[in-house]
């Protein structure tokens, strides 16, 4: 895919967050090698157009780069990623909170996104159904992902086993936004879909 401004921006954001955390932990890491690997992965990646989840696609690419260009285990890379993003104040502002995320006014846009995703214009992009919670449900917003861009990217890069670590990041992000995420299965673990259910804490 084209390595444009958006991919550079997300890459810079993830790289700076992780490298600040690496410095705190006094880790001996080749920053340049990680950055170059990220760029290489993004350029080789299948295009997903102007996907709403481009940030997640880039997050997956950077996680692969971290694993390839550091001596750290996947678990240690996950912890570095998690702690780096958690300590980034700008990231907290960018992800927002439960009130903004669960705003009913966003539902028409989400439903259009879902309909567009089922056209499968881009092989690696996410395909999603939106589930609106009812008063009888214990969630307000649900997603059933039938295709996962991160899983596709990891599979293309020959490291599908790394996808499950990024699944755990969803709980970190939900916690930052003061939301409760319930999920019973993921594509990364061999299921047919990922069933996200979000509610307020």
Residue map of PLM features:
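Hydrophobic, Leu/Ile/Phe/Ala-enriched alpha-helical segments that form helix-helix packing faces
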Residues: 23, 66, 70, 118-119, ...
């Amino acid at each position: 895919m084209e390595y444009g401004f958006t991919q550079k921006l997300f890459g810079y954001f993830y790289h700076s967050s992780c490298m600040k955390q690496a410095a705190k932990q006094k880790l001996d890491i080749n920053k340049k090698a990680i950055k170059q690997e990220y760029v290489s992965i993004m350029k080789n990646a299948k295009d997903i157009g102007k996907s709403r989840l481009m940030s997640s696609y880039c997050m997956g690419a950077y996680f692969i780069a971290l694993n390839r260009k550091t001596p750290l285990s996947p678990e240690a890379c996950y912890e570095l990623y998690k702690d780096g993003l958690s300590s980034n104040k700008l990231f907290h502002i960018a992800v927002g909170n439960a009130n903004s995320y669960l705003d009913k006014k966003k539902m028409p846009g989400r439903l259009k996104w879902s309909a567009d995703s089922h056209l499968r214009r881009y092989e690696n992009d996410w395909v999603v159904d939106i589930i609106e919670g009812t008063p009888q449900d214990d969630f307000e917003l649900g997603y059933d992902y039938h295709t996962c861009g991160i899983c596709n990217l990891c599979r293309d890069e020959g490291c599908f086993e790394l996808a499950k670590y990024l699944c755990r990041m969803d709980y970190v992000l939900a916690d930052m936004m003061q939301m409760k995420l319930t999920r019973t299965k993921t594509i990364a673990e061999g299921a047919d879909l990922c069933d996200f259910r979000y509610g307020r804490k």
